[in-house]
Amino acid sequence: MENLKPFAVVALLEDKPERGLRRGQVGTVVESLAPGVFEVEFCDNEGRTYATLALRSDQLMVLHHDLVGVG
């Protein structure tokens, strides 16, 4: 999943207790930092950022809001 694009909505696949983040929290890709590494921003329901950190693609799952074909 190295081809994440800016503004992709993703879920965290592992806890990051040092940053106060838990598996399943939803964030937005801000930019690609290196191959397979992305800056992800986590915001509350009011749009206030509470964490921004670099994450590898294997720590993230892309979330889809539109119907996506399988197969």
Locations of regions flagged by a protein language model:
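Histidine- and aromatic-rich ligand-binding microenvironments
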Residues: 1
